[in-house]
Amino acid sequence: MSGLLHTTLSGLNSDSYCEISQYRDQHFRGSRQLQEKSLKISSTLYVGNLSFYTTEEQIQELFSKCGDVKRIVMGLDKIKKTPCGFCFVEYYTRADAEHAMRFINGTRLDDRIIRTDWDAGFKEGRQYGRGKTGGQVRDEYRTDYDVGRGGFGKIIQMQKANHQPAIY
């Protein structure tokens, strides 16, 4: 077996995909140790960088390839109640969630590379974006529109592709 292929395949079999990231939910009620313990036994994943147009059905179809999905909670803008680019996927077992971390993290859905991370477990209210404008905090630091997320960027890109003048 070639060196590169062997390295790639052994990487898929490693536990590095299932390690807990450095991110910690600042709204978690409890100590850092309790949060870390919760993350290590959790069967819930945070899924970020979703298109605003990605549907729950698309999430179900993709994530069910790794096991039985218990529920999906789509992230919503807390003011407009529209999708804002993230969701929570809860599996029945930790093993199925680990498969999703290993095989789905970094894949493309709706022309966007999605990222997954462990979540200590969904609690009511967490489905709403935490940014001041209702969406995600991360979106508030963007300097221009994200084409994959919709808004004027999507319209302008389509007009450029069709060589039509943009009207604002």
From Swiss-Prot:
Subcellular location(s): the record lists:
Nucleus; Cytoplasm
Q: Which residues form the RRM domain?
A: 43-121
Positions binding mRNA in this chain are: 23, 46, 115-119, 126-130, 136-137
Gene Ontology CC: one annotated term: nuclear cap binding complex
Q: Sorted alphabetically, which Gene3D superfamilies does this protein's record hold?
A: 3.30.70.330
UniProtKB keywords = Cytoplasm, mRNA processing, mRNA splicing, mRNA transport, Nonsense-mediated mRNA decay, Nucleus, RNA-binding, RNA-mediated gene silencing, Translation regulation, Transport
InterPro entries linked? NCBP2, NCBP2_RRM, Nucleotide-bd_a/b_plait_sf, RBD_domain_sf, RRM_dom
| Source domain of life | Eukaryota
Task: Cite a single GO MF annotation.
Answer: snRNA binding
- GO biological process terms, semicolon-separated: mRNA cis splicing, via spliceosome; mRNA transport; nuclear-transcribed mRNA catabolic process, nonsense-mediated decay; regulation of translation; regulatory ncRNA-mediated gene silencing
Keyword flag Nucleus: yes
Family indicated by similarity: Belongs to the RRM NCBP2 family.
Briefly state the protein's biological role. Component of the cap-binding complex (CBC), which binds co-transcriptionally to the 5' cap of pre-mRNAs and is involved in various processes such as pre-mRNA splicing, translation regulation, nonsense-mediated mRNA decay, RNA-mediated gene silencing (RNAi) by microRNAs (miRNAs) and mRNA export. The CBC complex is involved in mRNA export from the nucleus, leading to the recruitment of the mRNA export machinery to the 5' end of mRNA and to mRNA export in a 5' to 3' direction through the nuclear pore.
Q: Assembly and interactions?
A: Component of the nuclear cap-binding complex (CBC), a heterodimer composed of NCBP1/CBP80 and NCBP2/CBP20 that interacts with m7GpppG-capped RNA.
| The protein's name in its UniProt record | Nuclear cap-binding protein subunit 2
The source organism is: Taeniopygia guttata (Zebra finch)
